[in-house]
Structure formats: structure tokens, C-alpha cells
UniProtKB/Swiss-Prot annotation:
It comes from Clostridioides difficile (strain 630) (Peptoclostridium difficile). The keyword Zinc does not apply. The gene is rnpA. It catalyses: Endonucleolytic cleavage of RNA, removing 5'-extranucleotides from tRNA precursor. The lineage of its organism: Bacteria, Bacillati, Bacillota, Clostridia, Peptostreptococcales. Its EC number is 3.1.26.5. This is Ribonuclease P protein component. Pfam families: Ribonuclease_P (PF00825).
Amino acid sequence: MDFNRTKGLKKDSDFRKVYKHGKSFANKYLVIYILKNKSDYSRVGISVSKKVGKAITRNRVRRLIKEAYRLNIDEKIKPGYDIVFIARVSSKDATFKDIDKSIKNLVKRTDISI
């Protein structure tokens, strides 16, 4: 998930740290957890549970989230945050437009926008 200013959040321990100590915001399709880190870049992780559907569906939702983030958010957030997006079950029927709108809404509600 290497975008211009973002790296991937990969380790389970990193995800757990963000869940435990981070702030969360939610809407119909997604939940976002945000935690300030001590680096000069942001890290993003995406979690899609098996409750969402089979592998094809989960991967589709993951791709939609990645693309919406890449197109709209990557350049517009302050560096130095760990961000985790969690897809809700309702996201399996969502279109790209729905996910895109959802991500924009969540980021606007947080204080990570430039």
C-alpha cells in the first residue's frame, strides 16, 4: 500500500495498538481508528472480516477502500498517523461511490485533514 505519503500497516501488534489507544469514528459502511505515531509518514491498514463475505467479496471491498483512499485522501492528510479502516457488513453491497463518500465523511470528522 505504498502511496505517495503513506505506508502499509501490516503487523498484528500495530493493529492492536491502534484499536486499543486510537480514536474511532463510524458510519454505515466503515469504521476508522486513528492514532498519532512518531514518524513523518502515515501508515494505513484495512481490515475486512469474514462476516462481510467470501474471499472475492472481501477483496473487492478492500480494493474499493484502497482506491478511494488513494484518489482522495492520501495527499490530504497530515503525516504522522496510523489509520485503520474496518469494513462493516453493509459494505459488501456498496458501490465505489458509497465507499468514497463514506471515507470522505469519516476523514472530515477527524482532525487529520490538512
